[in-house]
């Protein structure tokens, strides 16, 4: 059984990390611009640093960090509450130590000190990876941990911006899908992207107009997702990424407020990820997968919200999207299709896949 579990871990990891994913599974996954925005728009949102630790020297700071590592090594078990508490403690301790060393220019003057900090930091990450195996974490646990350890958790300024943007996205739900076949939808989708690139996006109104029109196309596309397995969609993915990148460039140039670009585009991405995930669940519950490749692609798209919704994006979840996420969480353990895909007992899949998702999150901390 242990050998089979180890094999499953490798299979799950390969599925998650594989670059041989059909382009359709990445249509919704245009997060590169969000990472660009994180770098070039630092004034949009920020969390304050609270240096609660008082160091007398760089050696003192490193000893504190080493002591925290020792406390983690002593932990033999964990649960969701403990994991969240320790992850937040790690972040605050790491930030405080790092900022102290940076202020003292230690990283520039002492390579040995920099190497020690990195070694301790990597060892702490290893201990958190170990802790993922000390409790049977569920999909709900993974979501809770991501929510409660986000640096934007309880950020009132961000929540205010989300509340301001929410009516725009709620209104999109009332717009009907296109009543046409997949060929027509793909043709119209490509035309929208081409026209948008030609026109350009230079104002908030331009951005919202694009998000609204794109939303109709994307939801219409998802209605035919099951029959898109043979379609080449790389051009749609590339054009979408190009437009998103241009939106953030416009924000950098001051044409669109940085806050608006970050919040609306983040909410757009979260919305698409969850729409894609729920559409796949509906298909996989009601239709027979045409091939193992299609089944793997569906699994990849279903778990994408757990992987791709980052610390900023998860803080923009609306109540409706949290409900959608709960639906995904409730459906994943029920479907025997997933267990069949990985050829293993369903109970094992129900805690091993969440474990791997949690490990992936730890690697981003």
Predicted regions and their residues:
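Charged, low-complexity interaction regions
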Residues: 76-83, 107-110, 198-202, 230-233, ...
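Extended amphipathic alpha-helical interaction segments
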Residues: 166-307
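C-terminal motif of bacterial Sec signal peptides marking the signal peptidase cleavage site
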Residues: 43-46
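A cross-kingdom marker for long, charged
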Residues: 248, 252-258, 262-275, 299-365
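N-terminal export/membrane-targeting signals
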Residues: 32-40
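Bacterial N-terminal signal peptides that target proteins for export
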Residues: 4-15, 19-33
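Long, amphipathic, charge-rich alpha-helical segments that form helical bundles/coiled-coils
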Residues: 121-135, 154, 169, 189, ...
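Acidic/polar, low-complexity intrinsically disordered N-terminal segments immediately downstream
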Residues: 5, 50-156, 160, 164-167, ...
């Amino acid at each position: 059984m242990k050998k089979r579990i180890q094999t499953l871990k490798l299979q799950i990891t390969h599925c998650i990390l594989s670059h041989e994913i059909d382009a359709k599974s990445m249509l919704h996954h245009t997060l590169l611009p969000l990472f660009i925005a994180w770098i070039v728009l630092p004034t949009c949102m920020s969390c304050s640093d609270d240096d609660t630790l008082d160091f007398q020297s760089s050696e003192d700071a490193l000893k504190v960090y080493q002591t925290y590592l020792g406390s983690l090594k002593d932990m033999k078990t964990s649960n969701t509450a403990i994991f969240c508490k320790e992850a937040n403690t790690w972040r605050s301790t790491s930030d405080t130590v790092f900022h102290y060393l940076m202020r003292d220019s230690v990283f520039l003057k002492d390579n040995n000190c920099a190497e020690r900090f990195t070694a301790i930091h990597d060892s702490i990450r290893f201990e958190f990876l170990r802790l993922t195996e000390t409790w049977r974490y569920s999909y709900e646990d993974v979501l809770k941990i991501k929510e409660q350890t986000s640096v934007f958790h309880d950020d009132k300024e961000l929540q205010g911006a989300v509340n301001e943007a929410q009516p725009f996205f709620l209104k999109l739900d009332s717009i009907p899908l296109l009543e046409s076949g997949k060929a027509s939808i793909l043709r119209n989708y490509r035309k929208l992207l081409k026209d948008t690139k030609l026109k350009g996006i230079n104002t908030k109104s331009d951005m919202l107009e694009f998000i609204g029109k794109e939303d109709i196309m994307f939801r219409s596309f998802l209605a035919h997702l099951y029959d898109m397995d043979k379609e080449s969609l790389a051009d749609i993915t590339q054009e979408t990424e190009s437009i998103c990148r241009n939106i953030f460039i416009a924000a950098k140039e001051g044409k669109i407020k940085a806050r608006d670009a970050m919040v609306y585009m983040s909410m757009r991405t979260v919305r698409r990820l969850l729409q894609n995930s729920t559409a796949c669940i509906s298909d996989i519950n009601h239709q027979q997968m045409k091939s193992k490749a299609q089944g793997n692609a569906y699994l990849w798209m279903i778990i994408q919200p757990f992987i791709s919704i980052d610390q900023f994006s998860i803080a923009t979840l609306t109540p409706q999207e949290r409900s959608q996420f709960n639906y995904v969480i409730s459906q994943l353990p029920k479907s025997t299709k997933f267990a069949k895909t990985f050829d293993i007992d369903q109970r094992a899949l129900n805690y091993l896949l969440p474990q791997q998702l949690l490990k992936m999150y730890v690697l981003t901390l």
